[in-house]
Amino acid sequence: MSVNMDELKHQVMINQFVLTAGCAADQAKQLLQAAHWQFETALSAFFQETNIPYSHHHHQMMCTPANTPATPPNFPDALTMFSRLKASESFHSGGSGSPMAATATSPPPHFPHAATSSSAASSWPTAASPPGGPQHHQPQPPLWTPTPPSPASDWPPLAPQQATSEPRAHPAMEAER
């Protein structure tokens, strides 16, 4: 009865190994026998393709998993597929691709004006605050007075707060002059 029990245990281990590793039953049996029926050792040998102390050099080739998703694709084929995916993505998903391209290209026309208004308002006082700390509003108007002719049409729609800060800056500049 002990021999049958060991045989049953071995058969259960083989079935479990086949389910876990995804290999054939004869491969599982050979690996388990070579690993002295130690499941983890046989499984590790199967996935790492390490040599078991017994010489099975020609057998190791047959023990490599054939149905695992980790099989690497052919590199040139993968590059071709990626290039096709990129090209088809831009053409097929034109509805979703063009808004992404539009958002990628449209902010630069808006960002330079927003950058000149908001970043200039935030960067010029910090750059000009060391020469005149109490004259915080004085450096802004001289820098803004040359620029309003070009973006003057964009300023009221973009930021009404900038328009309200502009009149405050001009009286402060004129009062200090």
From Swiss-Prot:
UniProt similarity note: Belongs to the UBALD family.
Superkingdom, taxonomy of origin: Eukaryota
Region: Disordered, residue numbers: 89-177
Source organism of this protein record: Homo sapiens (Human)
Compositional bias annotation for Basic and acidic residues: 167-177
Any matching Pfam family: UBA_8
InterPro entries xrefs: UBA-like_sf (IPR009060), UBA_8 (IPR054109), UBALD1/2 (IPR039310)
Compositional bias ranges of the Pro residues kind: 139-151
Sequence ranges of Low complexity compositional bias: 112-138
Record lineage: Eukaryota, Metazoa, Chordata, Craniata, Vertebrata
Name of the protein in its database record: UBA-like domain-containing protein 1
